[in-house]
Structure formats: structure tokens, C-alpha cells
């Protein structure tokens, strides 16, 4: 994290990242514990939604965010093809069990295993030490992240091909074979908001799988070519810089997802998320229902809740990106505040 040349800098309790910045073991513990919290939240929320589900009302007009995602990938349907929630409770309970496993892993890495992988007795573990200004170290870790993303894409593509996912065009579950047409995939960069072919959606995921697996192998196998200069990021590559780039990525994805989910009914079917939304502009963009909302989310549809929350989270993630990027570049916000009074008026006036 940025210290502005102060070797004895201290951080407040709210700066959680500062406690794991140079301790890769604790960093892994935080990752595992965070995964446990996410799994617990997903499992618990799914059970709550399932318990309150009313089959006489459209799913998109109820509190059904997690149920809608499961229905979209073909989970919860009986033999007649009707969504009854069969098997959903099992998935939710599995998430609760896994949350305990992840939480236990977080505790083990936090209190039992070494706090820094560099001190580990296992040679393979020492490769995952954190050297924020070492491009060879960072590209090695990045490569493993890309491999996991690639495997996740393969799993999704194979799930659609073997089990099948919900197709709103026929209002039923069907097996979807991916269309790996690179021309189509390239063209969908510009019209993905209106994509209406599940084959093309799966083709995009298949392409990402190959791309990410190849990128992962490349980043693991390669090292810095030539001298590590300022042009290549020397003295800029840091924990704060990487945090800022991560926030930029997740913020951008959240904003794109908001625009996509607002109107696309192929990936986000009306049967599960509610009707398409209309964009409005006030202080910032927001989306409203085009029909009367439901019984949850303050009278709004699942789609309206999903889209607006995604957009505003993305917006604030991007603000976090700008904050941490400026700090990584050496901008000291404290000096700015010291020179200004209320409402930004310079103290020298």
C-alpha cells in the first residue's frame, strides 16, 4: 500500500487490505474466508427465497434473485418441464456446507499455516509469495487465476451442452451446442446487448475458455523480457496499483452487466427476471419498470433490483479505482485536505 515514504505508516481498522498486503499466507486466508461468506450468503438467500416463493405469481415479481439465476441455467424443473424448485434446496444446503469448509480453510491459513508463503516449508507454496513490484511473480500468480476462469467457462459450456439451459424462445430446457464462429464472436463485441442466440452465447464462453487457458499457460511459463524499466511499470507496479486495476475491472463488468440485463431477454428471460426496463437520467442513469412491479424490492421487479444495484456498485467501484490509482501514482490526498478548508476553499484565503 502507498506509504508516501513513511516507513512507519499505520492504517485504521477499516483498511483491511493493509493487514495482508505483504503477507501472502494471510492474503490466502482472507480469500478463503471471503469465499465462505459468499457461499453462505448464496445458500442462505436461496433458502429464504425458496421458502417464500409463491407459484401463483411470476418469479420476476417476487424476491427471487437467486432462484432466477438457477432457473436460467436449467435448475429447479420437474420432469414435465415446469419450474417447481426441485433440487434447489439441495444446492443451497451444499453452499452452506461449502461455506463452512471455506471458512475452516480461512481459519487454518490465518492461525495455523505460515503468514507468508515465502517462509513455507513447501517449495511449491513459496512460488506464491507476494512481491508486488516483481513482474515475474505477479504474472505467475495472474496465470493461475486465468486457468481457474478458463475451467469455469468450460464447465458452463459443457453444462449447457450436456444438461441444457432454459431457452425463452421455446420456454423450455434444451441442450445448447456452442457456436465457435470467430467472426460472429468478434461482431458481438458491438451488439452483445441485443444477442438472441444461446449458441452464440455459449460460443463466446468457449472462446473465452481457450483464450484464458492459453493466457494462463503463457503467464505461468513466461518471464520479463529485457530490463524492467519505468516504461514497463517499474516503480508503478504495486499492491495499490493492482488493487486499483482490480476495482476498475469489476466496476466495468458491473456497469456492462447492468445495461445488458436491463433489456436482454435471452440471457435474462422475462419469465424469471420480469419485464424489460426503461432507462432514465437524473443525477445519474437509473432504470425503471415498464409494468407494475412485484411484492418485493420495494415494489420493483427482480430485473430492476438486479440492474440498478449492479450499476451503482459498479459506479462506486470505479471511484475506488480512481482513488487507489491516484494513490499508487503518488498523489497524497491528505496534503490536499490540509491545504483546503470547508467546501474546498483554500485556507490561505
Swiss-Prot record:
MF terms (GO), sorted A to Z: chlorophyll binding
Species this chain originates from: Prochlorococcus marinus (strain SARG / CCMP1375 / SS120)
Signal peptide: none
Membrane keyword on record: yes
Entry's transmembrane regions: 27-47, 57-77, 91-113, 201-221, 241-261, 306-326
Protein name in UniProt: Divinyl chlorophyll a/b light-harvesting protein PcbB
Cofactor(s) annotated in UniProt: divinyl chlorophyll a; divinyl chlorophyll b
Extra information: This low-light-adapted strain contains 8 pcb genes.
Induction section of the entry: This transcript is moderately expressed between 4.5 and 72 umol blue light/m2/s. The whole antenna complex is most highly expressed under low light; as the light levels increase antenna complex levels decrease. Thus at least in this strain the amount of antenna complex is controlled mostly at a post-transcriptional level. Transcription decreases slightly upon iron starvation.
UniProt cross-references to SUPFAM superfamilies, sorted A to Z: Photosystem II antenna protein-like
Matches recorded under NCBIfam families: PS_antenn_a_b
